[in-house]
């Protein structure tokens, strides 16, 4: 596995955990600036390696899920977060993208000298909220949540004294959504912590935590007694426009009673933005509230609309974070930690030093490639950085201060936890018909679940909320279970007895019974949750959902060849090999067999192959996926058109091949299939595709003109005269696309006994619904045999 890929996986796992603690628990374990650095690093790595981007990456989404204790609210306009700038050049690059991305008359949006005008305001460190007004009255308050769905905190926002319950003045739209930040001033934070200490209550680490925890209290009386404030920074949905510029919007909102930052300013071009940023940075400590940067937005709203959005953020706004903080210290030692996948990761142990107000004694080193890049030796004087007050990392060695006693950093030959052998990972790639093996950046303990560190992390992942969701099994409890040898694999969780649990620290009768019930309740997971819980390298929550939705059975997932897996959305060859290798491993198979056998797990949602996946194969696509040297999609299409079947391509003689392709490509194809291993591999892929129920689609030109061309059909419930697979095949032979979900674009729904939500939705949408008899009649009318 490449260093970049390994680091991406580490960053995603860490960011997911921090997202959960920040957005769901309101108990962040790291500063926001540290999160920003991790996110920025992940984003940069993914930009350099776009093939490694997956739907489950934190860069593809905002935040985490809303708490179920509050009513969920769907935002009509997504509450997106902002991209970040850490250096002045980042802001200049943002300005360049804005300038080049605009296609409007210069007089409409540029200031003096043709420079884009930006609004400038401090980035408050609080909790983003949405305030919805109807006819001037506050009717709802909501948190951002995951950007799409938040929490209804209406009763709590009403207690924030500077949020108007009724807008002042007149002229406001019938519907107006105001967005802003609820925060706590430095003085208010100090008063709150002092009063909490007096009554023996919980104190807060910083004003942001205090604001978030106060605003999301289930008891609004508690919120009312907290010194919360609000500052608006923009709009969501409105029934009418209220200004042509962002600053105009905020000035209008201020007239209607909304609190707006006193530091709001207009800047002509990027250099004035930088001057504003430097000024605020110098005055940062004297401000009455915490800020972690400055937000710049294109002021002209028409320009904002022209620039639009990316997946996670607007193109017309950016948050310029405060700079890195660095200090010198001594590297005392390098220790090695073992993660869930067995990765043995170096960690720097430092002579404690205060960086940006925080005492730092440890720093990440990522992997041994990073140690080599830095030229790091134990005893060195090193520069530690906390970018934007961030997580500590070693950024440089001061070589001229290296002592004579400095020692090289060496990877342990045996695991520091279990004593098993440590080996360097190997990356196996198949390209142009050949397999190549290269060394990865990661070292791994081969002990697997016999290694206590790996076992603990594997169980923590297995029981997590997005996996098997077994409540009551916290990290400390899992450590006890492993340390006392009560569990040796996830399967052992289902063998735990009441007598074993009640003896654990922190457990009594009620909590023991609750845990046993939670474990028992996890015996019927969805296929997607189970796949995710297995902890397959590179398989996050979204990839697990894709596997479950497309292959629809664990057996197919286990058997799937890497080339077959690449037919799935967003599954590249490297990830496909990781999945295939995981299920090829005998130890992993034994654990899965135990879970599904003696432990009694019953996977839900297994059944027929996903309709879109089943119809996604073409002969030319298969040929292309073989990675024959010099043969791309165009040549693959010519081969499919000429020969019609894979076997005909494999057995084609030189003359036929030369009549189809240029000499170089023809020779490459013949040489490829003359290697018996390649020919057999191709046959195996085709056989598995057919065994799974996939089939070659005709080219679009052959579908046009068929009676059901352009129509989308959905099959739901059971059929008696023919299987759904057969019905699907017959409909597709008539040109129809058979989908697994109902939408407004669906033409006809065939509903048999047991049809559920799909039938309900079809009726709600007023779609044509046929029973089995009507389907058979329709097929017969179109000349398709039904017996």
UniProtKB/Swiss-Prot annotation:
Domain BRCT: 703-787
Name of the featured protein: DNA ligase
UniProt-listed NCBIfam families: dnlj (TIGR00575), PRK07956.1 (NF005932)
Residues the record marks as active site: 123
Any single Gene Ontology cellular-component annotation: cytosol
Residues reported to bind Zn(2+): 415, 418, 445, 451
Species, as recorded: Pseudomonas syringae pv. tomato (strain ATCC BAA-871 / DC3000)
The EC number(s) this enzyme carries: 6.5.1.2
CDD domains noted in UniProt: BRCT_DNA_ligase_like (cd17748), LIGANc (cd00114)
Reported function: DNA ligase that catalyzes the formation of phosphodiester linkages between 5'-phosphoryl and 3'-hydroxyl groups in double-stranded DNA using NAD as a coenzyme and as the energy source for the reaction. It is essential for DNA replication and repair of damaged DNA.
UniProt similarity note: Belongs to the NAD-dependent DNA ligase family. LigA subfamily.
UniProt keyword annotations, A-Z: DNA damage, DNA repair, DNA replication, Ligase, Magnesium, Manganese, Metal-binding, NAD, Zinc
Pfam families linked to this entry: BRCT (PF00533), DNA_ligase_aden (PF01653), DNA_ligase_OB (PF03120), HHH_2 (PF12826), HHH_5 (PF14520), Nlig-Ia (PF22745)
